[in-house]
């Protein structure tokens, strides 16, 4: 297994309240509404002053690859796009992390990821969820 825990993310300053909320997303382009929901709930948690981390694993990692949203999503009338939801989340300070093992399995490098999206090992997710005030999975 490639995961070497990078616990440096734990030393980053929390939001003023010190509360942590983790959202795990395993859905990708096969279920875009679930990804939109994960991004929406991440934005809501961040707006409630939680330090919010969206951890992407499996199919969700594909969504965080440069150019993938524009290539694969077909926008629908009166429905927010993934890009809109992603931009909202990032503007609110949501931290987005991608599973390094999923990245390795799919030959995705850190340079392939969208700006601001960081690779992170599975042990980091375990540590974060053990400290979180709450978590959701999509």
Protein language model regions, located:
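Short internal beta-strands
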Residues: 52-57, 96-100
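N-terminal beta-loop-helix "entrance" segment that forms/cooperates
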Residues: 60-73
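A short aromatic-anchored loop/beta-hairpin motif
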Residues: 88-89, 97, 106, 110, ...
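Aromatic- and Gly/Pro-rich donor/ligand-binding loops
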Residues: 137-138
